[in-house]
Amino acid sequence: MRRSLPARLAVWAVLAAALSSASAAEAADPPTGQYRAFWVDTFNTNLSDHADVLAVVNNARAARANALFAQVRRRGDSWYLDSLEGPAEIVAPAKPLAPGFDPLADLITEAHAAGIEVHAFVIAAAIWNRHPTILAPPAWPDHPFNRHGFNQATGALYTERDNWLTRTLIPDGTASVTFSGTRIGAEFWVDFGHPDAAAYTADVLTHLVERYDVDGLHLDRIRYPEITIAGQTPTSGTSIGYNETSVARFNQHYGRTAGTNPAQNDPLWNQWRRDQVTNVVRRIYLGSIAINPQVKISGSLIAFGGGPTTEASWNSAEAYWRVYQDWRAWTEEGILDIAAPMAYKAEHTATIRPQWDQWSEWTKNHAYNRSTILGQGGLVNAIEGSLRQVRRAFTPSAAGNYASGLSFYSMATSNIAVANNPFSIPAGQSTPVRSFAEFASALTTGRSVDGTRAYEDLAANPVPVFPAEASVPDMPWKSHPVAGHVMGFVRDEAGQVVDTGAVNIAREAGADPPPATRTTIVGATDGGGFYGGVDLAPGTYRVTVTPLGQPAYTTACATDVIAGQVRRFDVTIDREAPTVVLGASPRELWPPNHRTVNVTLAGAAEDAGTGIDSVSFRVLDEYGLVQPEVAPISGGGLPRVDFSQAIPLEATRAGKDKNGRTYTLEVTVTDRACQARTAAVTVVVPHDQGH
């Protein structure tokens, strides 16, 4: 039976000297600021020219908002010009982008001038939503759907490693499934269990962070798709994630029969799918803050149905078992700065109303060392219902914990009509859809724009929910960091990535006592060999890697973790120290006339693993006199380095030294895995010539 990693790789078991955060249930101080954000979805809000951008910013200002989650990637395309992907896919009659216009750059300029943060809102996994044969394919030839979804030349899906799409085993024609299980409803999704799809997504998004002065990167649909079909339960699992490459990786890792599919309720398969999503979140998080330590990584997270009421009931939440998005583990690990569950609940429906409070309670109690905000759904509420939810969002949980704010979905649909609205004033009136200006006025005054109509009981609530502007909350792990992070890639002796290899990141013993944060993290590499550790105590660390079926390998090199920084520490498994062949000429210095003689130290160093890093020299004199230093030679990672070095030695000895004077010439060869081998030769100044 094959030895495998523990099931909960996604959580990354953490061994800590002490944790700086309180437990999930411990009370926290109320935040000093308050996030007031709007989702700006480009499906329903234009960002096509400067006038559109000004309209969005002015709406935010009117509502006293301080952050915008503005959608700039919908389906593998870009609402920004400096991108690794093609331009925005806009289909008539939607408004096209003005020529040469960069929506994201312009929004950053205008919003920052107004004191408003801009978070780039990106759809991560869903990459295409039109029929590939009836309607036109993506316009950009290198669109991931064109290259790794549907092959227009053959009129068929790509196969094997070339196919990045996730897949259900539910037959086509059932539950709106088509295209051999790869189209769920209207959508095609990439599968993060495919290493190339995960790497591509991380590269696209970290490139955005590198090129734009965004305050944050906001991840949407960072999960598997939900499938609407009867009979799905936490026990049954879901038929999704069956990308051929991901399944092959799973079978290899767990010693399953190649070419077979795991059952949808297989516990190992369930955790595997959660791990694939968690791995890409970790990779995006560390890659982004390595570029800009102050950028805030957030996510719009699944909050279907009612919220968990106990720790154990999280496993029955649909985020966990249906779409394999274990976002509770993400906040605990620290790979999201802001968790924003989409708790879109109709306040006017008595059976649904408690769900808002359940998710509010859970969210406030599960921030750990990070922030949480509540995603409020204007798209399912009248203004009156939304105001009630906002007020409850800013109260503490029963355990005394607070959310850091909330975000409204969306700027385009801030409210809906509600028949017999129980919260209208007076109660029971049918309320129509109101304008965004009315919604903003309700937030800031509690009244309509013209002041004639109240949106809540002003006697009970004399102060509106947003009576004045608010600053965004401080994030002390960014403003005053006490912990650092490490990330890298692991390759084996043949240079191949180590897929799902066990990883242990450990602080060296004997170092200064760390602050109250992590000193050891246990986890695994992803399918591309990526690993990472978050919130480590500053100090010196080594990494131990255990590839499947192989002995553990601990790096001879170490890396220093520094508070507030991400250290890049790649690992190539190299179990053999370099070899060195050494000779010297002359080996005897005669006559002993006190003159300096150049001894040629020549040889060759070889390392078939990581290559030669350096060749260094040392002269030892039995008389104990200090000898001149000799500069080392860089190996440049070459597998072989030939060297010839002149070493100046004094041809002299003590007159009564019958054994003569002995110099020992050492050469130390170090490879790029920090393994070293030393060879030495002796040179003698004899008492008598020939002796």
Task: Identify the role of each PLM range.
Residues 31-37, 45-47, 125-207, 211:
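Active-site-adjacent "subsite" loops/lids of carbohydrate-active enzymes
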Residues 52-77, 336-338:
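Catalytic domains of carbohydrate-active enzymes, especially glycoside hydrolases
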Residues 324-352, 363, 367-475:
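Substrate-binding cleft of secreted/luminal carbohydrate-active enzymes
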Residues 487-500:
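Structural motif
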Residues 497, 501, 507-535:
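Short, acidic Ser/Thr/Gly-rich low-complexity loop/linker segments typical of extracellular
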Residues 530-542, 548:
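Short Pro-Gly-centered beta-turn/loop motif in secreted/extracellular proteins
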Residues 548-569:
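Structured interaction patches on ligand/partner-binding surfaces of diverse proteins
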Residues 574-691:
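Proline-threonine-serine-rich low-complexity tracts
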